[in-house]
């Protein structure tokens, strides 16, 4: 079975992005800038933001983190976003989720200029994705990362049956729409399964490409997978494990050990889809920089 190594691909991609950033710096004297806003003290969010900032700096981009208190008002957050929208040195704006309950996440998403929405969450970017205008939008980073993996591993997708398990706005919905497009690593027949789907194995057993993004540890078992299928595991779930120093370990939505005896190729957890998400965020930021500067 082939292991689809997101850690390696993300490293290759980051090296490519660094070379591009260095080239644009020598030509224009400018570099891409990403600003991340974090509201509150959520530990997981703080880790994610630190990782994004660290990777950003490693490839030569300007990274700015704006920290706001838990009691920040929606009005203040949106005013800050509007200032960033008008700042020519900022090419990507990301508001780390989740947000405190007094803030409407959708209102915040709408406040971000679509041309700087490098997370790909703005309805304008999602609409352009659905219509196939991928050269004029930003694709949500996790689906975009999966597309990159499929392409770099030369996974045959044209005319294949892709089943996406999960319908979140961040992964499931954009992933399904992406796999419908007429691209080298897409052009599939697509089925979406979700919490109200009856007899999910009936659909997953038909999948040539199975993408699991349901948020349940080990949900996809070997008897749900068609022999020879390509399995992409988006899930990141923390489960107790007394044998580890931390007392827990990370697993995906797929029972990796069992499914690896059936699948032809799989992404591991950790080290599969996860590392690609930040890499694609930076790729989107570079694309924004190029568009804004007509490069």
Swiss-Prot record:
Catalytic activity: (6R)-5,10-methylene-5,6,7,8-tetrahydrofolate + NADP(+) = (6R)-5,10-methenyltetrahydrofolate + NADPH; (6R)-5,10-methenyltetrahydrofolate + H2O = (6R)-10-formyltetrahydrofolate + H(+)
GO cellular component: cytosol
InterPro entries assigned: Aminoacid_DH-like_N_sf, NAD(P)-bd_dom_sf, THF_DH/CycHdrlase, THF_DH/CycHdrlase_cat_dom, THF_DH/CycHdrlase_CS, THF_DH/CycHdrlase_NAD-bd_dom
A GO BP annotation: tetrahydrofolate interconversion
UniProt keywords, alphabetically: Amino-acid biosynthesis, Histidine biosynthesis, Hydrolase, Methionine biosynthesis, Multifunctional enzyme, NADP, One-carbon metabolism, Oxidoreductase, Purine biosynthesis
First and last residue of the signal peptide: none
Gene3D superfamilies: Leucine Dehydrogenase, chain A, domain 1 (3.40.50.10860), NAD(P)-binding Rossmann-like Domain (3.40.50.720)
EC number(s) reported in the record: 1.5.1.5, 3.5.4.9
Amino-acid biosynthesis is among the record's keywords: yes
Residues that coordinate or bind NADP(+): 166-168, 195, 236
Pathway participation: One-carbon metabolism; tetrahydrofolate interconversion
GO molecular function: methenyltetrahydrofolate cyclohydrolase activity; methylenetetrahydrofolate dehydrogenase (NADP+) activity
Function: Catalyzes the oxidation of 5,10-methylenetetrahydrofolate to 5,10-methenyltetrahydrofolate and then the hydrolysis of 5,10-methenyltetrahydrofolate to 10-formyltetrahydrofolate.
UniProt family annotation: Belongs to the tetrahydrofolate dehydrogenase/cyclohydrolase family.
Known partners and oligomeric status: Homodimer.
Protein name per the record: Bifunctional protein FolD
